[in-house]
């Protein structure tokens, strides 16, 4: 893996291929390796970069998180993630780059576009679970508070079951999300990663400071992506609302919420039709 030294962290990332830079931002998994099957399909067209977000996978903190980062209303980590992606983009290319964020990674991508639009050539938001600008935002914020409370008091299994039911996660995705790692060490790491995400992201990222105006300013750069196998899920409803209010196009893409793993060939074909 490649390394970029940043304030407070060593950011590590996979890089394959040639051509214009395309950065993938992972969601709850936090690690870029989930994009490697997709990267193989795109490496003849793009320099594909798949990031381990700060404090996930091989990326490591060189300074501790501030105590406030676990506050449900803290934007520290999502803003720091966005800054990391912008600095990575500038280190890799003198030109604006392509960016795709999935799930909570798409929320990071929104903050990249809002705060660092100069680094973005084109950007895609794949099934973002953000609620800030929705008419029923308070309802969803309360639901996420309840889910985190359940995880912390009743355990990860019960809390994640409620999470899946509340967001109407498709069966194809629920099965993959609940699949344990192959080794004991992997299962321990998986548990730690999910608990970290629960405490520091479920509430903070989904209710972070993004408005519809942040999209309309740069609507010519944005594509919304909804999976063909995750119809009816909350993240898809978010994209439908953005589309209704801004007319930013939605493109159907193969697979579910984890479509880049489930159907990488078809996922890549859609990206190449969009950007190739």
Swiss-Prot record:
Name of the featured protein: Uncharacterized hydrolase MW2501
Domain AB hydrolase-1 intervals: 20-137
Transmembrane segments: none
Top class in the EC scheme: hydrolase
GO cellular component, one term: membrane
Native species: Staphylococcus aureus (strain MW2)
Sequence segments annotated as region (Disordered): 57-76
Keywords attached to this entry: Hydrolase
Pfam families xref list: Abhydrolase_1 (PF00561)
Record family assignment: Belongs to the AB hydrolase superfamily.
Tree of life domain: Bacteria
SUPFAM superfamilies xref list: alpha/beta-Hydrolases
EC number(s) on file: 3.-.-.-
Gene Ontology MF terms in the entry: hydrolase activity
Keyword Hydrolase: yes
């Amino acid at each position: 893996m490649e390394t970029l030294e940043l304030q407070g962290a060593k950011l590590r990332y996979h890089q394959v291929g040639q051509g214009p830079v395309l950065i993938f931002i992972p969601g709850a998994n936090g690690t870029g390796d989930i994009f490697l099957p997709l990267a193989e399909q795109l490496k003849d067209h793009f320099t594909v970069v798949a990031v381990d977000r700060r404090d996930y996978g091989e990326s490591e903190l060189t300074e501790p998180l501030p105590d406030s980062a676990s506050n449900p209303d803290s934007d520290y980590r999502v803003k720091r993630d966005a800054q990391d992606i912008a600095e990575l983009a500038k280190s890799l290319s003198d030109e604006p780059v392509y960016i795709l964020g999935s799930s909570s990674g798409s929320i990071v991508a929104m903050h990249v576009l809002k705060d660092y639009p100069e680094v973005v050539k084109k950007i895609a938001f794949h099934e973002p679970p953000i609620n800030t600008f929705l008419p029923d935002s308070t309802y969803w914020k309360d639901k996420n508070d309840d889910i985190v409370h359940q995880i912390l008091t009743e355990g990860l299994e019960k809390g994640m079951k409620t999470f899946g039911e509340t967001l109407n996660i498709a069966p194809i995705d629920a099965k993959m999300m609940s699949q344990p790692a192959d080794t004991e060490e992997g299962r321990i790491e998986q548990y730690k990663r999910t608990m970290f995400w629960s405490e520091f992201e479920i509430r903070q990222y989904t209710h972070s400071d993004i408005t519809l105006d942040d999209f309309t300013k740069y609507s010519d750069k944005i594509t919304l992506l909804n999976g063909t196998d995750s119809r009816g899920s909350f993240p898809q409803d978010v994209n439908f609302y953005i589309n209704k209010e801004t007319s930013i196009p939605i493109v159907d893409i193969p697979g579910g919420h984890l479509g880049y793993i489930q159907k990488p060939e078809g996922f890549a074909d859609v990206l190449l039709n969009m950007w190739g």
